[in-house]
Amino acid sequence: MIEKLIFYMGYPFVRYALIVGVLIALCSSLLGVTLVLKRFSFIGDGLSHVAFGAMAVASVLNITNNMLFILPVTVVCAILLLRTGQNTKIKGDAAIAMISVGALAIGYLLMNVFATGPNLSGDVCTTLFGSTSILTLKIEQVWLCVVLSVVVVVLFIVFYHKIFCVTFDETFAKATGIRADRYNLLIAVITALIIVLAMNLVGSLLISALVIFPALSAMRIFKIFFSVTVCSVVLSVCCAISGMLLSILAGTPVGSTIVAADIVAFLICCMIEKIAGGK
């Protein structure tokens, strides 16, 4: 097995896939703790459906680099989703359901009406659940992922204390002069960036798992925000690497294998919590 891994690591596309996988896992887990604590977990699910709709439009328009179209559309929808959720007539969960289901339906409709290839079901399945496209990345795509990942990490580090305050008590944050609405907007925009980055890795339907599972796993062991965030990052990166290597060796779907690794990590953390609690 070790020899087989060394053999595969000799290929540039495998190294590119591991780099992108680690960066995506890092970014998604950084914000995951905040989204779970703020009960924004499903915003990732909603934006992933929006990204699916944007990808369908890009496919119909024959846009060569669809990332340049999907990214701004998802960011704009993240802002609209946040603004709509603050509307007293439409609550947050209803706004997410409305936008996500609408984008998913319109995207699938466009792919049916303006089918660009003979294998429609394969294209849809690939978009929803991820594909081997992570193993066919070009160096330009890797650099784009690196740049966006650096942006996400820098924004999180620079505004860490503000995000911390807004996460736990918006009323207190406002009382201390923090513009909570601006930082909620920042969280939504960063989430949109992460969603777009993760689409090639796990597909639009499984993206939420990368955000939620590492955070929930870390919360089983640690109770301090910083410790939970660090643990979440470590678990997410380890699960991404192990999932991708197992996928390469066993020939299983990349996204599903990574999510399965996250589930196993969550179950192990739950066992550790029970054992520690028993003592």
Walk through the language-model features, giving the residues of each.
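Membrane-interfacial amphipathic/re-entrant helices at transmembrane-helix boundaries
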Residues: 1-26
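Transmembrane helix-bundle core of multi-pass membrane transporters
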Residues: 4, 96, 100-157
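Alpha-helical transmembrane segments in multi-pass membrane proteins
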Residues: 20-28, 54, 58, 69-77, ...
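Cytosolic-side transmembrane-helix boundaries in multi-pass membrane proteins
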Residues: 255-259, 263-279
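Transmembrane alpha-helical segments in multi-pass inner-membrane proteins
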Residues: 200-256
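Hydrophobic alpha-helical transmembrane segments
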Residues: 18-23, 67-72, 94-98, 142-147, ...
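Short loop segments and helix-boundary regions at transmembrane helix junctions
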Residues: 33-48, 52-118, 218-230, 247-251, ...
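Helix-loop-helix "hairpin" substructures at the membrane interface of multi-pass membrane proteins
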Residues: 137-214
